[in-house]
UniProtKB/Swiss-Prot annotation:
This is DNA-directed RNA polymerase subunit epsilon. RNAP is composed of a core of 2 alpha, a beta and a beta' subunit. The core is associated with a delta subunit, and at least one of epsilon or omega. When a sigma factor is associated with the core the holoenzyme is formed, which can initiate transcription. A non-essential component of RNA polymerase (RNAP). Belongs to the RNA polymerase subunit epsilon family. Keywords: DNA-directed RNA polymerase, Nucleotidyltransferase, Transcription, Transferase. The keyword Protein biosynthesis does not apply. Its EC number is 2.7.7.6. It comes from Oceanobacillus iheyensis (strain DSM 14371 / CIP 107618 / JCM 11309 / KCTC 3954 / HTE831). The keyword Transcription applies.
Amino acid sequence: MIFKVLYQELPNEVPIRERTKSLYVEAETIREVRKKISDSDHNYNIEFVQPLDEAHLQYEKDTGKLELENL
């Protein structure tokens, strides 16, 4: 399953919507996504992890925003 992760790059600052970024991770569960990110070199402030259904996944592909992270 593909998950969309909304995050802030600076973990010590208050989240600001305009600074929110997203990445896409393939995993089985939300817990696995969080573990992959925490085990990587990234120190992100994760705001939300969203599983993508087929329609949403297709939309992300069509807009060209979908690029899977290799964590």
